[in-house]
Amino acid sequence: MGKEKTHINIVVIGHVDSGKSTTTGHLIYKLGGIDKRVIERFEKEAAEMNKRSFKYAWVLDKLKAERERGITIDIALWKFETTKYYCTVIDAPGHRDFIKNMITGTSQADCAVLIIDSTTGGFEAGISKDGQTREHALLAFTLGVKQMICCCNKMDATTPKYSKARYDEIVKEVSSYLKKVGYNPDKIHFVPISGFEGDNMIERSTNLDWYKGPTLLEALDLINEPKRPSDKPLRLPLQDVYKIGGIGTVPVGRVETGVIKPGMVVTFGPTGLTTEVKSVEMHHEALQEALPGDNVGFNVKNVAVKDLKRGYVASGSKDDPAKEAASFTSQVIIMNHPGQIGNGYAPVLDCHTSHIAVKFAELVTKIDRRSGKELEKEPKFLKNGDAGMVKMVPTKPMVVETFSQYPPLGRFAVRDMRQTVAVGVIKSVEKKDPTGAKVTKAAAKKK
């Protein structure tokens, strides 16, 4: 078998008709875990429905439809393998909740694949002021997705077909935009492809022999291997807390940083409750330690279910334990708010697993969202497209961290009127020390 390949997460972004589904479907179809029988069934259905354009989007449409109907799709269907990596495609962004998911992210993407429609009119629509290309790229960068591959898609439909001139024009324009966002275009591969015909997806295309760079598959193999933050202090935001007969209280969540293991003394923020971890389980198997990315349940002693809630964060009691945030200052980008936002605005913040109302206590500065330079001190308000530094105060106890130290606990979505109206990253946190926090006997013994 040899060493198992590294797992990486990829987020596919781009304008609505750029061909994201077709391209992703194609990769999954050719390299992925979709059972041949399933494919044959899809192909037959596609033929019956006269969908000549079946190719690959159909695969993804079927998967999505089944997923949305609540049929649990084997997640392997969203995976494919390159020579070097196991790749998982995280939430394709056609989804309403894409932005929220990308932030509270079940997983941080290691690389964004930006799909561009190269056809006449298609490219212009995607990159225009209202197009999603810009917003997605800005979001990816703000949320710390530092690597990117850019696919100039639909090269089979440019005028003339497979036009080098069109490719060059697009690379020039997209590079200048990505540079403004903060990416370094010299480090980005621009791969001319056809997700539909398959040019340069996996094999080199003779139609594009003027292009000397990597195919999409090769570009994926050139992604820098991500470093997983297991050497940082533990942060494990709770998703749920169960009471299990004969075992006791079992909090469940995903290790974001650090490790958790049996025998450890953990402190839960924001309350400061401290106790010993008896056992750690993943998929019903006991673990000696759980690492970042692992979804685990762990059993704690002498703790009632009511003492823990979703959004609490487990941490090592001696290693920078998680504490309540009295206030925090964040860089916020306003995305789709119809009016203007001033001091006193009180939306809901989705940060890691917590969902808590906060107050915009003070608009500190308005900044240029690309360069980060200050434009104005203490602005009266922020509106769509603006970025600013904002001091926020939670209305209930909550744990947040700075983005630089604990990224998954330092990025958030601002929700109001049932949509994401802003995104932000936390620059500094003023923490409160817990008063009268309970320390269980098991933990006291360990001290």
From Swiss-Prot:
Main localisation: cytoplasm
Pfam families cross-referenced by the UniProt entry: GTP-eEF1A_C (PF22594), GTP_EFTU (PF00009), GTP_EFTU_D2 (PF03144)
Gene3D superfamilies the record matches: P-loop containing nucleotide triphosphate hydrolases, Translation factors
Subcellular location: Cytoplasm
Domain of life: Eukaryota
Binding-site list for GTP: 14-21, 91-95, 153-156
Region (G4) location: 153-156
GO molecular function, one term: GTPase activity
N6-methyllysine: residues bearing it: K261
CDD domains reported in the protein's UniProt record: EF1_alpha, EF1_alpha_II, EF1_alpha_III
G1, as annotated region: 14-21
Region entry G2, spans: 70-74
Domain tr-type G: 5-230
UniProt modified residues of type 5-glutamyl glycerylphosphorylethanolamine: E289, E362
Modified residue annotations for N6,N6,N6-trimethyllysine: K79, K187, K306, K396
Record region (G5): 194-196
Residues modified as N6,N6-dimethyllysine: K55
Record family assignment: Belongs to the TRAFAC class translation factor GTPase superfamily. Classic translation factor GTPase family. EF-Tu/EF-1A subfamily.
Classification via HAMAP family: EF_Tu_A
Function: This protein promotes the GTP-dependent binding of aminoacyl-tRNA to the A-site of ribosomes during protein biosynthesis.
Name of this protein: Elongation factor 1-alpha
Organism ancestry: Eukaryota, Viridiplantae, Streptophyta, Embryophyta, Tracheophyta
